[in-house]
A protein has these predicted regions:
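Structured catalytic-domain cores with a bias toward divalent-metal coordination
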Residues: 1-84, 91-92, 96-98, 111-112
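A short helix->loop->beta-strand "cap" motif at the edges of active sites that frequently abuts
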Residues: 28, 155-159, 283
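Solvent-exposed loop/turn segments at secondary-structure junctions
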Residues: 36-40, 87-90, 134-136, 166-170, ...
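Extracellular ligand-binding/catalytic regions of CAZymes and related secreted enzymes
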Residues: 49-77, 151, 177-179, 268-273, ...
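Structural motif
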Residues: 84-88, 114-115, 130-134, 255, ...
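Helical hinge/lid and interdomain linker segments adjacent to catalytic or ligand-binding clefts
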Residues: 90-175
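A glycine-rich, often tryptophan-bearing local segment used as a flexible ligand/cofactor-contacting loop or short
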Residues: 136, 140-225
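Catalytic beta-strand/loop cores that center a nucleophilic Ser/Cys/Thr
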Residues: 204-284, 289-293
Length: 312
């Protein structure tokens, strides 16, 4: 080790053009990373920096060729949670989940994307959360290999929380879904007079519905003033899939009111599961159709859900 060589932290914004000119003039070996746009997921922007630093350290001989892009923290924490923010994830969900994580002592949360999952990033976590957005787009972003990685993570004992789109992702009835919980979603197409054939998953814009927990729901998620008034935005309407290879799910909460966009949807949501839990391999799965993470008063439900799938 050469004691004369060390890293210097910079203060303020670097002048990229001046840095390039200086490196060229001095003949210095340099790496310049242009910050990606804010429209890109945070996990992707952070990943770019990690990859750059790894490349730099490999270039100067500090790291070997097989060095990972992500490592576990030195301090052992009670709960390490990965929050998916890649393709198909909405913008507010990950932010709200980060607020939820602040209420869980001795925990760490980190945003991850499809590339991280493909590289084995889930090995560093106890729980993965897939937030609202689009379940099919999340599945497409993951690809077959990425979805297999998520399934393997849960099968080995990892925890999975799916909210709205994430609950669609966990379902058993799509070609692209993970099939980690034994429920179907109400997504068939029906003929609407004067409109044509429409899929039944769409029930209109964001709205408020009521939800009531079961005895099992109280044990896992805690108690509050019920029925809960909770935000709903086209989350899955769940019913048993009856797949022999999967464990039956347990209902933790029921919808006690409904919203519908088409008359044929009337009566198909009220008294159906709002929250279910199940097992997949050695792991735990918890799917939430509405959005408790959107309400500061209801975030404790999500915190309890995360702790439960994480084995705490």
């Amino acid at each position: 080790t050469d004691s004369r060589k060390h890293f210097l932290p910079l203060r303020g914004t670097a002048n990229g053009s001046l840095t390039r000119a200086a490196a060229e003039r001095l003949g210095a070996s340099s790496l310049i990373l242009e910050t990606t746009t804010r429209e890109q997921p945070l996990s992707l922007r952070v990943r770019q920096h990690r990859v750059m630093v790894r490349t730099l350290l490999q270039e100067i001989g500090i790291l070997g060729d097989g060095a990972p892009t992500l490592t576990s923290p030195k301090d052992r924490l009670d709960l390490r949670v990965a929050i998916y923010d890649g393709g198909g994830a909405g913008t507010s969900g990950p932010r709200n989940l980060e607020q939820v994580m602040k209420t869980i002592p001795r925990s760490l949360n980190w945003r991850i994307g499809p590339a991280d999952i493909l590289e084995g990033a889930l090995d560093h976590f106890d729980v993965v959360i897939f937030p609202g957005g689009s379940g099919s787009k999340q599945a497409a972003a993951l690809g077959i290999q990425g979805r297999d990685k998520v399934r393997e993570f849960i099968e080995r004992g990892g925890g999975f929380v799916g909210i709205c789109a994430g609950a669609y992702l966990a379902a058993a009835n799509y070609s692209w879904s993970l099939k980690i919980c034994n429920y179907n979603t109400f997504c068939e197409t029906r003929e609407i007079p004067g409109v044509g054939r429409k899929s039944m998953w769409y029930r209109g814009p964001s709205s408020t519905v009521t939800m009531q927990l079961t005895t099992e729901g109280h044990e896992i998620l805690g108690r509050g003033v019920e029925p809960f008034h909770i935000r709903y935005h086209n989350g899955p309407i769940m019913s048993p899939a009856g797949i022999p290879e999967l464990h039956d799910y347990q209902v933790l909460g029921w919808f006690r009111s409904e919203v519908f966009h088409y008359e044929t949807q009337r009566g198909t949501m009220v008294n159906t599961p709002a929250i279910v839990s199940g097992k997949f391999g050695k792991g735990r799965v918890l799917s939430i159709s509405p959005h408790p993470e959107s309400s500061q008063k209801l975030r404790y439900l999500v915190a309890r859900a995360i702790r439960w799938v994480g084995g705490l």
